[in-house]
A protein has these predicted regions:
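Conserved catalytic-core segment of NTP-binding enzymes
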Residues: 5-6, 11, 108-223
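A structural signal for short, well-ordered beta-strand segments and their strand-loop junctions
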Residues: 11-14, 78, 130-132, 236
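P-loop/Walker-type NTP enzyme "switch/lid" segment
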Residues: 17-121, 247-249
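Eukaryotic short linear interaction motifs
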Residues: 19-21, 87, 161-162, 192-194, ...
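A short helix-to-beta-strand connector/capping loop
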Residues: 68-78, 125, 179-181, 228-233
Length: 290
């Protein structure tokens, strides 16, 4: 939401096809009428016929509800995973059995991005594309996480399982492109009773520093442990019971509190960090130095 408050036009694409969920932030899960087609449909169709002419208005959903979009905000769009029904699983299975991997999969994702940008160009264009993906080990996750983006935001916790996944993701990010993407790490859902102790912060930062020094930073250019704004420098998003379950922004009874929680300083800091990587000076960004 902070990007929208910065008057940026944002496109979200759900590529976590094993557990697509971005659409459930904006529509009830059982309301299929609001979603026509999504990422799974695009990949299946383009894989069968790379020259297929696609009407992107069937894929791109303008999110315009006044319950979560104010009149002075940028524009928000969504390409969902697809309609979440039994047919979705069949489409996903077909993709998995069509030898859709490696460079072919990467080419289809690049074409999806191009088609989205072309479709929205006449409506003011897109400033940021946010791609939701799990940092897994299959081709789709590896391509979306490491080979396509200018930057990657990694969400994790201080646990063995989380650190193992983060380490693999950081290693992949550092070696998949000639110019490695920038990285931001987030300690998600941390703290107790709304507070994150200095000990907890220090422990997470130390482990993050170890992983980035070993797998991401060049040997001759390694920042200090407490260097601010570097890849290993965590953003701490406190645990919120309100955000721990479903986040139904379409629910008029809950949206005010949800928007309040999503306006917490940590989310602003994350947005400012992203914008600064692209040389932008966010409105209100001076707060970082206060």
């Amino acid at each position: 939401f902070e990007l929208l408050r910065q008057h940026k036009n944002v496109l979200m694409i759900d590529t976590d096809l094993e557990a697509p969920g971005l659409s459930t932030f904006f529509f009830p899960a059982d309301d299929e009428g609001l979603i026509n087609k999504g990422t799974v449909d695009y990949l299946q169709l383009k894989n069968m016929d790379k020259n297929a002419v696609i009407d992107m208005t069937e894929y791109i959903i303008p999110l315009i509800s006044p319950s979560y979009i104010d009149s002075d905000m940028g524009k928000l769009y969504l390409v969902s995973g697809g309609q979440l029904n039994d047919e979705f699983l069949l489409k996903l299975a077909r993709i998995d059995t069509q030898e859709l991997n490696g460079e072919k999969l990467k080419a289809l994702f690049i074409q999806l991005l191009k088609d989205c940008c072309s479709a929205l160009e006449s409506d003011g264009g897109i400033d940021y594309i946010l791609i939701d993906s799990r940092a897994g080990f299959h081709d789709m996750a590896g391509i979306v996480t490491a080979q396509l983006p200018h930057g990657v935001v990694l969400f994790g916790k201080d646990s063995f399982q989380s650190w193992f996944g983060i380490q693999q993701a950081v290693r992949t990010i550092a070696t998949s492109q000639t110019d490695k993407p920038f990285a931001i790490i987030v300690d998600s859902g941390c703290g107790f009773n709304g507070l994150v102790s200095e000990e907890e912060k220090d422990n997470f930062r130390a482990k993050s520093y170890e992983i980035f020094c070993t797998n991401y930073y060049d040997n001759d250019i390694q920042p200090g442990l407490n260097a601010h704004g570097e890849a290993h420098d965590p953003i701490f998003i406190r645990y919120s019971a309100t955000l721990a379950g479903d986040i139904p922004l379409y629910d008029g009874k809950k949206v005010v509190e949800l928007k309040k929680q999503l306006s917490d300083w940590s989310y602003k800091e994350l947005t400012y960090r992203i914008m600064e990587q692209f040389g932008e000076n966010p409105m209100g960004g001076s707060e970082l130095n206060e």
